[in-house]
């Protein structure tokens, strides 16, 4: 399943149950463009995890809320609470490990 788009209006409702991997990104960010296909691949493979995207240029309030000061930033939110965060381009193997840690 493709990642969903989060805004300040739907963020809390979409992340309140289960594990959600939230990709804070921007259209002008080269590393973000390289991260996207990795996240898309994981989203297809891991059906028990929700994947979502937040455009930091359009959703500055969310970027501030999660203290995003570099992109890409990936936030791992379990049952509405931030449990892990990774900044920078991240490999598929590291993301898989972070997802498994965040599920526990």
Where are these regions (language model features)?
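Non-catalytic, surface beta->alpha helical segment in thiol-disulfide oxidoreductase systems
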Residues: 78-104
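Conserved redox-active cysteine motifs that mediate thiol-disulfide chemistry
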Residues: 24-38
């Amino acid at each position: 399943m493709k990642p969903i788009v989060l805004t300040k209006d739907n963020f809390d409702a979409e992340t309140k149950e289960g594990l959600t991997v939230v990709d804070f990104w921007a259209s002008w960010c080269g590393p973000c463009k390289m991260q996207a296909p990795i996240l898309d691949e994981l989203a297809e493979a891991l059906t028990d995890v929700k994947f979502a995207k937040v455009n930091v240029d359009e959703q500055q309030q969310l970027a501030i809320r999660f203290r995003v000061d570099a992109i890409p930033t990936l936030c791992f939110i379990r049952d509405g609470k931030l449990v892990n965060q990774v900044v920078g381009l991240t490999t598929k193997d590291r993301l898989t490990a972070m997802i498994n840690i965040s599920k526990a």
